[in-house]
């Protein structure tokens, strides 16, 4: 009986030791997992800046090639998608700083991308239209933008995946 009790105690002792070891492993695993989650979370959040940098570099490339600001590009894209509209309506789609507003639209007029129209019944309203004579230039600009995006697609997708994983 003594031997059986010793054996039982040995088994119980091993079980207790196993539980202690298991608890130690679980605690360390949780700390490791927490650290990994925190590192992955931090990495994912930092990818916001990386993605923003890629987007900014696309607009910089367009600006360099076409001598148009980000706002001017967005105005054109909005006109192509939505059609002609008043300046006030465009303000809902593209944010242009008040001190840059006149210069922004006048630059697009000077470059002949758009033209302005004032209705006879309301001289205060200005409607902007895309200049359909620049249809070929529109296609070229869209191709340029598409190529700029495609050249960064993998990097931007990786950043986006890391962000979404947060």
From Swiss-Prot:
Inducing or repressing factors: Up-regulated during anaerobic growth.
GO molecular function: DNA binding; DNA-binding transcription factor activity
Record keywords, A-Z: Activator, DNA-binding, Repressor, Transcription, Transcription regulation, Virulence
UniProt DNA-binding region: 87-110
SMART domains: HTH_MARR (SM00347)
GO terms under biological process: response to stress
InterPro entries xrefs: HTH_MarR-typ, MarR/SlyA-like, Rot, SarA/Rot_dom, Transc_reg_Sar_Rot_HTH, WH-like_DNA-bd_sf, WH_DNA-bd_sf
One Pfam family in the UniProt entry: Staph_reg_Sar_Rot
Role according to the record: Global regulator with both positive and negative effects that mediates modulation of several genes involved in virulence. Also, modulates the expression of genes not previously implicated in pathogenesis.
Family statement: Belongs to the rot family.
PANTHER family referenced in this protein's UniProt entry, alphabetically: HTH-TYPE TRANSCRIPTIONAL REGULATOR MHQR, TRANSCRIPTIONAL REGULATOR, MARR FAMILY
Name the record gives this protein: HTH-type transcriptional regulator rot
Species in which this protein is naturally found: Staphylococcus aureus (strain COL)
């Amino acid at each position: 009986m003594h031997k059986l009790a010793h054996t039982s105690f040995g088994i119980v002792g091993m079980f207790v030791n196993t539980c202690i070891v298991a608890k130690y492993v679980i605690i360390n695993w949780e700390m490791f997992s927490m650290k990994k989650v925190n590192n992955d979370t931090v990495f994912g959040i930092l990818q916001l800046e990386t993605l923003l940098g890629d987007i900014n570099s696309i607009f910089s490339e367009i600006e360099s090639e076409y001598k148009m600001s980000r706002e001017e590009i967005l105005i054109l894209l909005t006109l192509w998608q939505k059609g002609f509209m008043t300046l006030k309506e465009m303000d809902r789609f593209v944010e242009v700083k008040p001190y840059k507003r006149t210069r922004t639209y006048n630059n697009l007029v000077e470059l002949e991308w758009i033209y302005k129209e004032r209705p006879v019944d309301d001289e205060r309203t200005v409607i902007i239209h895309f200049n359909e004579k620049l249809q070929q230039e529109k296609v070229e600009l869209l191709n340029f933008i598409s190529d700029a995006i495609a050249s960064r697609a993998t990097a931007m997708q990786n950043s986006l995946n890391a962000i979404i994983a947060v």
